[in-house]
Amino acid sequence: MTRVIGIDPGTVSVDLCGLDDGALFLDRSFPTAEALADPAAFVALLERAAPLDLIAGPSGYGLPVTPAARATEEDLRLAFLAAEGEAGGIGGLRPLARALARSALPVVFTPGVIHLASVPEHRKVNRVDMGTADKVCAAALAIDEQARGTNRPVHKVSLVLLELGGAFTAGLAVEGGRILDGIGGTAGPLGFRSAGALDGEVAFLAGTVPKSLLFGGGAAAVAGWDDADASPERFEHPTADRKSVV
């Protein structure tokens, strides 16, 4: 039997899912700011779920499968691509990753789309965000569910996975059970909070492109909402022309 936990560090929430031989034993969700404010408390929560065989840690843009205890500072820089103290984006992920690495928990960092050998090299040129590590995990789940639901082998599964998150919209292409391409949230279409791919001239006019810029300018901003009252459900009943445009 295998006892595992997956950590999904989203813009709005950090979610935990634990499976014991396929049966759910942990399903928790925390506001992101709250979860990352105290890495030690978060680690303690995971330790209470022991014994564990594996934890899929918060991996950002991903790394080749790497035990957290062996991850270097350069690995963490590449996985999270944010300067120390950067206020924009998901602040606190790197300190959490360090805390997990210092623990005795069996944490591994997992790959993003760009790390996959199944993705042709020419598609990776001048790309970074082809899909974060959590998107790869979502695609793996979709492939498995599609195979089981249609009673066909994995190599017969082809699909397009679209994920509409709290900030970003991303898409992954699967053919023959393998991820072949992806468009990550910062390179894709408009998201709920994120503007998605930026026109090069927009980036030029911005002057600088801090991490916070990647997390703004989305559908909620077009609708004129601030972060406190932003909710996708509000689009069901638009009350102004601007909301109708979105």
For every predicted segment, state its role:
Residues K124, V128-H155, G176-R234:
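Glycine-rich phosphate-binding loop plus the immediately following alpha-helix
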Residues P51-R127:
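Short beta-strand-loop/turn "lid" adjacent to the catalytic site in phosphate-handling enzymes
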